[in-house]
């Protein structure tokens, strides 16, 4: 068998105090939740462990424990415990290693081999197997450190070609020299060809010039500027001293998170080892966590932020000013909103901080006089939107011959606010139409106090994924409760909600919408329900919610640009959608008239296909939007349901508000040591609290006693169980123009209305347009 090797003399084995362990090898214990705890906030299935320390290095969490293996699973004790103890006896370890050395590989048990190669698995995978001696524990720690170093250079090693599917995107490859990472991601996301704004923007942006892009909603503006900056991120990944690549500013938090998600999807392989390279910094979330993430290596190379939170971070840490002053690209998404009141002051301070620091760096290094590349994108660029910012009346008195002259005026105004390297290149993919041609607009005329009823009618007649916009937060809250009382899944999002609750509500809406689509696809004969998201204008800009079929304007928007962005939540990525306005007669003579006149293009003309006359007359604003047909017999059957649901919604909201007011008053009184009951009479007599008393009395009038609430709910449930019938037909199912018996047997017709054909809002408007033509 050969001679035994003599043990090496003079060699001392150091016993490490700690070892790094994988979390899957730890003996986790489930956390017992007490029965008296009502709400655990969704944290179920938690596990805990003692005797383990947690260390975070560059965002990577590692678990460290001492050499006793009590915290390890039984399968790992043999591996870590016994083998490491045997290292203390050199002769014992040598003899065991020799036995393993001269064994046939077929005779070696799986446990022995794993124990022998526990700390050198990486070397075995490369085929460089050294002697099968048990490795010294001190070498375990050193090799773990070496592994981390290798992971940082993961992009320098060879790529397994078998893991990459062939890319066949000729339109993308002909557009610009894009990396394989981006092309692979575009193919996986099924973005097979670029949109119009992407075709015109990406090559120009990659040349480093300033760009001002205008395109309709849902046209792919995010990737138009996102692909070039992600290309820079990929090309700079191997550099050690990485400078920030891009700053992207958005007007809303939701839009910032959405842009972050879109950029991460097209560079997932890059983020696998540096997950914080693309970072979202918005309000409503922990600023301490954001400060900690910015300190990680290679983090924040692309930052998507709202101006308020980013300014707060800069003012708290001056090193961030120096760091982000070296940025290469500055991007303004939805720039028209960013430069309006409320955002521009913060944005101007940010630009001032960065420019001052950049000039200092340029003077010290004698670098180029060129500042960052500036990219501006929006769906609406109109000079009217900048009137509040301008102190000159010359802008208001201007009249423009065409759209290009108006955009040039906007650029002149922007150049006084934003620092460009030169006059930006204008890329306008919809010079004439302001609303996307894929959106079919419609008008619903209703009495001013019956908006809820007509909204319920639309959702019953045209079920689907619907987004409803309201001007007031109180309307959002009431409409949500109202629709839930009628059995329609409704979710809400508005500015009074915390950021966490906003994101949670959006996620629930998407899940419910996907669930309903799955049910309808698997069982087309099932009753189709509408899935509704009710929102204030906080969700009007930029949000890409997949599958929204209808947008309802519960109130007319306050400005034209808000209407354009609201309507743009449907008809995304080339699909079609419906935008319906609920309008009272009083609104039609004022706000509606102004809205339609502003939206009317200069080239809007009547198109008569049979007439060859060149004298075409402009279309009147009244004829630019068709009326949605309303069937009064169905509406009358919904009226009583709507009344009961509305009263119950008012009661629920008023009761919750009164309860919150009482709890707040009692809490404040306890903190001040005041007896609330003794002071109630004095408060009621005080003239200074007249407004509070009126508000309280108004809420009290909307409340209903418990017995009446139960009776109303029972009546409402009974009405909801009765199917709606077209023309109120209840007898002679085989008579009339439509054979109801035949439709019921063959499961044809509307799923919610007996005797009615299947309806689709989009097809209804298309048919009406054809009849009018």
From Swiss-Prot:
Binding site for ATP: 215-222
EC number: 3.6.4.13
Biased amino acid composition, Acidic residues: 83-99
Compositionally biased region (Basic and acidic residues): 73-82
Residue numbers carrying Phosphoserine: 138, 678
InterPro entries xrefs: DEAD/DEAH_box_helicase_dom (IPR011545), DEAD_box_RNA_helicase (IPR050079), Helicase_ATP-bd (IPR014001), Helicase_C-like (IPR001650), P-loop_NTPase (IPR027417), RNA-helicase_DEAD-box_CS (IPR000629), RNA_helicase_DEAD_Q_motif (IPR014014)
Biological processes, Gene Ontology terms: maturation of 5.8S rRNA from tricistronic rRNA transcript (SSU-rRNA, 5.8S rRNA, LSU-rRNA); maturation of LSU-rRNA from tricistronic rRNA transcript (SSU-rRNA, 5.8S rRNA, LSU-rRNA); ribosomal large subunit biogenesis
Domain of life: Eukaryota
Pfam families, alphabetized: DEAD, Helicase_C
Disordered: annotated span: 73-99, 114-144
Domain Helicase C-terminal residues, every copy: 452-615
Segments forming a coiled coil: none
Motif (Q motif): 171-199
Family membership: Belongs to the DEAD box helicase family. DDX24/MAK5 subfamily.
Function field: ATP-binding RNA helicase involved in the biogenesis of 60S ribosomal subunits and is required for the normal formation of 25S and 5.8S rRNAs. Required for the maintenance of dsRNA killer plasmid.
Record-given protein name: ATP-dependent RNA helicase MAK5
Gene assigned in the entry: MAK5
